[in-house]
């Protein structure tokens, strides 16, 4: 979706997360990226990010994508900065986070969003996707050559199923590629990011009830 959030909102999130991103250690392997920095706990650290998490258009699509369960919840939040020289990330599915459990084909457990804080280009490491691969089985093997770059301008958002094969691209530019990921999962699954610990309880008074429920302070099923 092009131009879903404003330049003012991008600047706010960049300000709020700058110190956390600078202090984050680069990854230690090819999956996390040795020139890639990640930091999470966006509900607590970035009030601007809460608007992305609660965006009504995104929540509507996520609800439809995960409609085979009674509820869905916030799964993971991160700012990811792919630096110059980063290698391509191995192609994967996000829902492999659940110990590689072989969920039935077509049964999505997560729904993902990638919000562009900078332009996403093929040169700076735009997320690479394999359209239609959410229908494939778990034993498929792919390389970067099988993918296409999800190029988009800053302020846009990429939506995709947790069963879609994808990966971060190689950054051959001189600039960082920075994005916010917000993932949602079925209400009865354990979240990848523990929202109960990442958000101090003394902040609850400042958070709307619908956000608290999305964080997991609600029934996990019916």
Indicate where each model-derived feature is located.
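Short hydrophobic-aromatic micro-motifs
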Residues: 1, 115, 158-160
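Non-heme Fe(II)-dependent double-stranded beta-helix
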Residues: 2-102
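Residues that flank catalytic or metal-binding motifs in active/ligand-binding sites
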Residues: 15, 38, 45, 75, ...
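A structural signal for short, well-ordered beta-strand segments
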Residues: 76-79, 113-115, 180-184
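Short Ser/Thr-interspersed hydrophobic loop/turn segments at strand-loop and sheet-helix junctions
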Residues: 79, 119-120, 163-164
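Catalytic core of non-heme Fe(II) oxygenases with the double-stranded beta-helix
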Residues: 86-151, 189-199
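Conserved double-stranded beta-helix
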Residues: 136-159, 163-164, 169-222
């Amino acid at each position: 979706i092009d131009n879903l959030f404003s330049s003012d909102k991008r600047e706010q999130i960049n300000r709020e997360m700058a110190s956390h991103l600078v202090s984050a250690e680069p990854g230690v392997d090819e999956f996390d990226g040795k020139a890639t920095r990640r930091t999470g706990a966006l509900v607590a650290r970035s009030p601007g990010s809460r608007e992305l998490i609660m965006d009504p258009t995104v929540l509507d699509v996520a609800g439809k994508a995960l409609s085979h369960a009674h509820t869905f919840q916030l799964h993971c939040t991160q700012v990811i900065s792919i630096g110059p020289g980063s290698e391509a990330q191995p192609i994967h599915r996000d829902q492999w986070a659940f110990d590689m459990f072989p969920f039935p084909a077509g049964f999505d457990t997560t729904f993902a969003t990638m919000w562009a804080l900078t332009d996403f280009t093929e040169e700076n490491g735009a997320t690479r996707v394999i359209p239609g691969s959410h229908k494939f089985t778990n034993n498929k093997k792919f390389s970067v050559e099988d993918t296409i770059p999800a190029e988009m301008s800053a302020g846009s958002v990429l939506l995709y199923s947790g069963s879609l094969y994808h990966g971060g691209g190689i950054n051959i530019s001189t600039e960082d590629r920075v994005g916010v990921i917000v993932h949602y999962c079925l209400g009865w699954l354990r979240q990848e990011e523990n929202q109960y610990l990442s958000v101090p309880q003394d902040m609850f008074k400042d958070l709307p009830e619908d956000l608290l429920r999305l964080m997991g302070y609600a029934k996990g099923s019916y």
